[in-house]
């Protein structure tokens, strides 16, 4: 098996390293990732600036671009002669729940892979070990990585993904250090936050107004998601991780809802 990896936290991120080490026990793994953090850039491509690559002693390839750039470059140039079985991105530092997928570079990289017909899985550690010491944080990522390997080896998820074109599997893993703290896996739908992330206004040393779009949220407030749930037993992704489950959300690239399209067509035409 051949797996291509990337992320949005950068080529030196602990989540990327932990996942690489875990996946390398079961597959040949290649890494092409940004040379610096690219959180929040979604599936943006660099079309006005050139991209440069640098191979690290680890064999990882660093790119001065976005996560989507990395996948685009890997599939069409660097590893264009390689038939990858799948692309796995992450492990992201922090959750990618609900509408996070619209902004996440980790998800955007997986999305780019699917546009080229490669099965893709985006992975995130909810909390990203933020509550832990550096050593404990490393254990959390290692635990999350081992759960991803179990998902690939103990379930037919890769075969399922291969038969679901234009879908990305979005995986969120609770931030714990021991596997026995995880209650299992749940298939979920994306949740929905009721409030936007705050904007912080500051004045820089030259007296100019400056604004920070905060990626570290205040307390999340989640909407009632019952209208998105397909059955009474289906959880949203945020509900699942809050209950100690690994959340698995299939996300379809085809965003046009057929029922809404039919309704509007009947009204407009």
Curated annotation (Swiss-Prot):
Top-level class of the enzyme under EC nomenclature: hydrolase
* Residue numbers binding a divalent metal cation: 8-9, 39, 92
This protein's GO cellular component annotations are: cytoplasm
- InterPro entries from the UniProt entry: SurE (IPR030048), SurE-like_Pase/nucleotidase (IPR002828), SurE-like_sf (IPR036523)
A molecular function GO annotation? exopolyphosphatase activity
Give the source's domain of life in one word. Answer: Bacteria
Q: Where in the cell is it found?
A: Cytoplasm
Q: Which UniProt keywords apply?
A: Cytoplasm, Hydrolase, Metal-binding, Nucleotide-binding
Q: What is known about what this protein does?
A: Nucleotidase that shows phosphatase activity on nucleoside 5'-monophosphates.
Query: In which family does this protein belong, per the annotation?
Result: Belongs to the SurE nucleotidase family.
Which HAMAP family would you find in this protein's record?
A: SurE
Q: Which NCBIfam families match?
A: surE
Name of the protein described by the UniProt record = 5'-nucleotidase SurE
What is the organism lineage in this UniProt record? Answer: Bacteria, Pseudomonadati, Pseudomonadota, Gammaproteobacteria, Moraxellales
Could you tell me the gene encoding this protein? surE
